């Protein structure tokens, strides 16, 4: 297919600042740091945010407004198919409820969990912002976790990592909803080049995150709290903490390890969220619902495509298209792939037909 060109919008000009090139020599490392600084500036452009650039650096604050398709462009998905089971079994209509019904990680009576739980319960507006960002992607992520038979609590991990912001960028050079640093992202299949950063691609980063968590869980003999701590602070650091406790004759469970302050709060955040979601009625907490149906579809585009042209074919704005496909840095998809776009479910078939003409 021949590319069609359109005048560059301010958004695409901003995106043009975000390319990262990962090489080993010092010059390229300096260029990477320069590009990442520029990406923080582009982050403010993308979010149309009047706050300081630090809002883009500190993703965990959950204050960044991401442009996602609104209710007019992102339908709630296809109707549930009537099956015999539905007459004898309650249909779960909320994705969060679907996930929480299978929560299994134990939640001890620990002051660190209590502190995090207290904060979340006092800030329901934070969860409202998070769920708004999560809405397009939550069903997909839930499905992928279920396919792998992993703990369903992992559906909450993007809240802890990035407040479900695929554009999030931390001071530690971690990017995307799952917050991968460049090296680990590349290690788990996320391409990073001038055109594209797979750490911000929801499909690539979700698959990479679940691959990494599976690897860590195996490394720590099925101990999910150790695996989660390692996801945050690095596998080597957790291994050293375990060895130090063994030498000192101390318990080696997560709660007794000498880990960085951030990591000591990281696992309790996840468990506090799981406890609130599982027991939201007891806490009188209005956790916003997300309908338990698919609302997006991954569409094969076959080759490089101009994003403005793709948005026109899909009948959506360029900002809405980029909100679903935040991995692309430039005016077009990467010539080297991945050759796919995430689109609203109700627009995918018509887009594919128009693209094929």
Regions found by a protein language model. Name each.
Residues 288-315:
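Primarily a LysM-type cell-wall glycan-binding module
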Residues 306-335:
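LysM (lysin motif) carbohydrate-binding repeats in extracellular/periplasmic proteins that recognize
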Residues 9-18:
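Bacterial N-terminal signal peptides
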Residues 67-120, 145, 169-171, 176-179, ...:
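Catalytic and substrate-binding regions of cell-wall glycan-acting enzymes that process beta-1,4-linked
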Residues 20-149:
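An acidic, Gly/Ser/Thr/Pro-rich helix-cap/linker signature
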Residues 1-9:
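Bacterial N-terminal signal peptides that target proteins for export
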Residues 116-129, 164-171, 179-207, 211-222, ...:
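Substrate-binding clefts and substrate-entry loops adjacent to catalytic sites
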Residues 150-167, 227-233, 322-325:
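Short, functionally critical alpha-helical segments immediately adjacent to catalytic or ligand/cofactor-binding
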């Amino acid at each position: 297919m021949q590319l069609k060109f359109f005048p560059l919008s301010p958004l695409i000009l901003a995106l043009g600042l975000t390319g990262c090139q990962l090489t080993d020599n010092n010059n390229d490392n300096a260029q990477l740091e320069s590009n990442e600084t520029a990406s923080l500036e582009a982050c403010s452009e993308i979010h149309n945010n009047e706050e300081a650039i630090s809002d883009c650096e500190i993703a965990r604050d959950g204050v960044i407004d991401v442009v996602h398709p609104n209710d007019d462009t992102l339908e709630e998905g296809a109707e549930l198919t009537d099956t015999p089971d539905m007459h004898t079994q309650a249909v779960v209509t909320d994705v969060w409820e679907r996930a929480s019904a299978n929560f299994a990680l134990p939640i001890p009576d620990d002051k660190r969990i209590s502190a995090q739980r207290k904060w979340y319960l006092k800030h329901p507006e934070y969860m409202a912002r998070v769920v708004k960002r999560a809405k397009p992607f939550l069903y997909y992520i839930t499905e992928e976790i279920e396919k792998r038979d992993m703990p369903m609590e992992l559906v909450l991990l993007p809240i802890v990592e990035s407040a479900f912001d695929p554009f999030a960028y931390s001071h530690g050079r971690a990017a995307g909803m799952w917050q991968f640093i460049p090296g680990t992202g590349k290690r788990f299949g996320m391409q990073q080049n001038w055109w594209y950063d797979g750490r911000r691609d929801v499909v690539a980063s979700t698959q990479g995150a679940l691959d990494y968590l599976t690897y860590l869980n195996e490394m720590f003999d099925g101990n999910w709290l150790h695996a989660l701590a390692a996801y945050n602070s690095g596998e080597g650091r957790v291994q050293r903490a375990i060895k130090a406790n063994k030498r000192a004759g101390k318990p080696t469970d997560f709660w007794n390890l000498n880990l960085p302050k951030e990591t000591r709060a990281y696992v309790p955040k996840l468990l506090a969220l799981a406890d609130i979601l599982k027991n939201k009625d007891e806490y009188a907490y209005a956790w916003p619902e997300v309908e338990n149906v698919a609302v997006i579809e991954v569409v094969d585009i076959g080759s490089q495509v101009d994003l403005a042209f793709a948005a026109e074919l899909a009948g959506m704005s360029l900002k809405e298209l980029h909100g679903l496909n935040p991995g692309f840095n430039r005016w077009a998809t990467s010539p080297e792939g991945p050759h796919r776009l995430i689109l609203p479910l109700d627009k995918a078939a018509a887009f594919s037909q128009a693209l094929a003409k």
